Amino acid sequence: MHTKDIKKIVLAYSGGLDTSAIIPWLKEHYGNCEVVAFVADVGQSREDLEGVEQKALRSGASECHVVDLREEFIKDYVYPVLKTGALYEGSYLLGTSMARPIIAKAQVELALKVGADALAHGATGKGNDQVRFESTYTALAPQLKVVAPWREWDLRSREALLDYLKARDIPTTATLEKIYSRDENAWHISTEGGVLESTWNASNKDCWVWTVDPEEAPDEAELVSVMIEKGEVVGVNGKVMSPYQCLEALNILGVKHGIGRIDIVENRLVGMKSRGCYETPGGTIMMAALRGVEQLVLDRDSFKWRQQLGLEMSYVVYDGRWFAPLRRSIQAAAETLAADVSGEVVLKLYKGQVTAIQKRSTNSLYSEAFATFGEDEVYDHSHAAGFIRLYSLPSRIRALNSKE
């Protein structure tokens, strides 16, 4: 890439150490180009956003745009994935993975608006995020150039980044003592690095940011009612709210009771394994509530296919293919399956556990008359004999043939 060809870059900016260093680095290495900082508000800590515009300008940005994406993030990105029941490798609720496409999409929109000719991000060359950002850029604005400083510069350590900023009199709150890498949005917070880099080290209290240690959570369980309409959470404890408000309400309860902690080793798209501690309190409660209604409403084959959709969706989202046709197809199928998934679930929150203890739906296929262990007048037990004979016919034929 010819650096002189780039006049204006829109950078996905967080205000952290890496992106604070990227602003002056871009100006130094790309012909003193103009750098516009873009900050996506996806529900991260308000402290992270406080003063972020001034910080970007002090680092050398010509402008800083903070865009509120919270409601859109939950409604148009989290809910479609939740509807499929997607869990990457069986446990990860895809908090970071779902946030990247909406951030990159809004970044592209700003770049087109301000007349930029390039996009930049602070993802490292080891991680998945570089793929997620750049796949979105390519899908939405292939004409824009892409700059990935971590794949170009020689600043390979936290100490080097701090020295780089100090030499240019750019203030930062980062220190060498902040050894963990974290990503936060309304759905979750992840912690990587530090003691977690050895899988033989147990996580410690510094690895958990939001949630109360389940052992220190209240000794008394708390009940919460969640309302579902067509596979989406629409209310909490009888109050109808927006998707983001529902998540906020459930996050508060989940944090209090230590809900939604996982400590996992996952397979990254780029080939290596990584370890992280993830906290998804409200999302874990939402998933349990949705599963409760699905158990009532979906027949056996429908539920099996919903599971298949969730498995495939988990890889599509994790791998950064949000804007691929396959994601849209999976989402369309999930919405069809969720058309009757409406109802109410009461869940018990207690020391890290969430349990659905009551559930109801006007579309329920559960029939107490058929399911009872007591005497009933609707189910003829003798009918089972013919069903079993036909169901097991292949096994019968195989056994008979083996004796010949």
Curated annotation (Swiss-Prot):
Task: Give the GO terms filed under biological process for this record.
Answer: argininosuccinate metabolic process; L-arginine biosynthetic process; urea cycle
Which InterPro entries does UniProt cross-reference here?
Arginosuc_syn_C, Arginosuc_syn_N, Arginosuc_synth, Arginosuc_synth_CS, Arginosuc_synth_type_1_subfam, AS_cat/multimer_dom_body, Rossmann-like_a/b/a_fold
Which EC number applies? 6.3.4.5
Q: Where in the cell is it found?
A: Cytoplasm
Q: Which residues bind ATP?
A: 12-20, 40, 122
Q: Which family does it belong to?
A: Belongs to the argininosuccinate synthase family. Type 1 subfamily.
- What is the protein's name according to its record? Argininosuccinate synthase
Report the source organism: Photorhabdus laumondii subsp. laumondii (strain DSM 15139 / CIP 105565 / TT01) (Photorhabdus luminescens subsp. laumondii)
Taxonomy, top ranks, is: Bacteria, Pseudomonadati, Pseudomonadota, Gammaproteobacteria, Enterobacterales
The gene is argG
